[in-house]
């Protein structure tokens, strides 16, 4: 749910509306965001009149499973949900925090779609086209950089934010567990230009705890 200012975001009327939207989504998970917006339009209009600025029900994400864990960053603007195969609350919350901080796009390199791979290959090819190196060397350079890119955007291959010496995949193996599904949502995602370094913020929180 988007509003225009932090002032309204802290308003109790806005918070209550967000909770109402959340409850409605939980009860009507199969409905699209457009259907949910239509169903709650009168409540939205009433809120707009109270707070004096526009409010939009913009996006919803949901995942399934028997073992669900969540993490919401301290600023309340970004959070994640993780579904594990087996119950492990500490592990689930740690991975949800990692997803919030590191923003993986896929679970594993094998899950990356062909369009994303092709787009990155084109970028890499443009970077090395003027290197005057032999073709086989250029191909190896592109392959190496592409594999690095795929690892960086894949949750399982990312260094664990609480212990960068190991990966999410290794932690899961240590606990004999696996990720069924995950999702991450950020306020204003796709709207705001400013980027937040949540990984650094999480590290700072850990050091102060």
What is each model feature region?
Residues 2-209:
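N-terminal assembly/interaction segments in proteins that build large macromolecular machines
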